[in-house]
């Protein structure tokens, strides 16, 4: 494998995802080729700013960009209108125009909010993703979904806006605490369940720490193909929500104290057990998924009762009227979209919890 990999995502417009070491130090020159001359506002949270903001801003300035930056409080609890409004006011005060750009430097929360700010400001300006976590690298930085949370639930206000570029600096993964790295492992394992044995067996045979760049590349290639076929999530792309209906409910029930990846892992395990117990999945698939999650430091269940989870899930964006679409794992590489009445969600979750 070469030291730097480039994957093209053929959406409208198309863009490139670049994966390799040292990309933040070189981000100015790489983005200059994509953006030309413009002003860049870097959005970053209070955890990531001390680690990488100075490096990124220096690289951008060296490439001739005018640069400003906004630091907001870290954490899912701040992924809300208050923070979004503050970012938008900063963009206006900094006099960004429609030819300028927002750079999302950080994890999934930063990418979601900075992207939504870019989609909203002046009815849409360009943005780039500079993911610093495994979760944002393998999943949320690609595909153009942007959002904030509402009191009723997660990611309920947002927009689709494809980034102009994504630079995944694998050096950033070295600074991640084990729990944060595991967060990203959950989304990678989810992708393995969706894509098939080739990718999933990689996670069964060894932990993701063995070859993170290759894991990122494989996950992005799979997701890019899905997004290209269904950019606005009308069909196949909904399968990427595997584990997320219950996962988002777990996050909400915890007041977002449980991080996204850990919640998705638990949601995936619950849905796999439910699918097998209800006769939808081949025997043994839920045990394989649970073992893989455990090997990568992730939970395989939740203490929240089925009633609380079902109630929280009814605010999920995948609900439509009196029905909700769930993603059912039938085998590794075979997942089905199943539209069910909302009244059936509780017994399905209960089956997945062994109740």
Label each residue range with its predicted role.
Residues 2-101:
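ATP/NTP phosphate-donor binding region
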Residues 2-4, 186-189, 280-355:
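C-terminal charged capping/lid subdomain of soluble metabolic enzymes
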Residues 20, 42, 80, 131, ...:
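Residue-level signal for inorganic ion chemistry
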Residues 74-75, 105-107, 242-243:
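Glycine-rich beta-strand-to-loop/alpha-helix junction loops that act as flexible
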Residues 88-105, 114-129:
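Non-catalytic interfacial helical region
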Residues 109-116, 137, 249:
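Short glycine/serine/threonine-rich phosphate/pyrophosphate-binding segments
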Residues 116-206:
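A glycine/threonine-rich phosphate-anchoring loop and its flanking beta-alpha core
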Residues 201-308:
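Active-site segments that bind and position negatively charged phosphate/pyrophosphate groups
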């Amino acid at each position: 494998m070469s030291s730097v990999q480039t994957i093209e995502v053929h959406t409208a417009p198309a863009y490139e995802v670049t994966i390799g070491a040292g990309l933040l130090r070189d981000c100015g020159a790489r983005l200059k080729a994509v953006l030309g001359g413009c002003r860049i506002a870097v959005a970053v949270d209070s955890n990531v700013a001390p680690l990488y903001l100075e490096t990124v801003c220096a690289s951008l300035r060296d490439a001739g960009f005018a640069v400003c930056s906004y630091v907001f409080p870290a954490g899912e609890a701040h992924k809300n209108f208050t923070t979004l409004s503050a970012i938008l006011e900063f963009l206006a005060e900094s006099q960004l125009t429609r030819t300028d750009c927002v750079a999302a430097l950080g994890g999934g929360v930063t990418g979601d909010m900075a992207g939504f700010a870019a989609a909203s400001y002046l009815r849409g300006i360009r943005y780039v993703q500079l993911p610093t976590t495994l979760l944002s690298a393998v999943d949320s930085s690609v595909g153009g979904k942007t959002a904030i949370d509402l009191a009723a639930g997660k990611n309920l206000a947002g927009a689709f806006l494809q980034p102009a570029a994504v630079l995944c600096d694998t050096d950033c993964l070295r600074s991640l605490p084990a729990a944060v790295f595991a967060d990203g492992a959950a989304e990678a394992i989810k992708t393995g369940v969706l894509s098939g044995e080739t990718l999933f067996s990689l996670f069964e045979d060894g932990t993701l720490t063995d070859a993170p760049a290759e894991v990122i590349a494989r996950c992005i290639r799979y997701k890019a193909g899905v997004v290209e076929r269904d950019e606005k999530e009308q069909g196949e792309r909904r399968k990427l929500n595997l584990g997320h209906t219950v996962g988002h409910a777990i996050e909400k029930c915890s007041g977002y104290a449980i991080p996204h990846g850990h919640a998705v892992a638990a949601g995936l395990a619950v849905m796999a057990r439910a699918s097998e117990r209800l006769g939808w999945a081949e025997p043994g698939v839920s045990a394989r998924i649970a073992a893989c999650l455990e090997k990568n430091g992730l939970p395989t269940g939740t203490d929240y009762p089925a009633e609380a989870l079902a109630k929280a899930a009814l605010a999920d964006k995948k609900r439509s009227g009196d029905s909700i679409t769930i993603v059912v794992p039938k085998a590794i590489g075979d997942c089905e979209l199943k539209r069910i009445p909302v009244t059936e969600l509780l017994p399905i979750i209960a089956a997945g919890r062994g109740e």
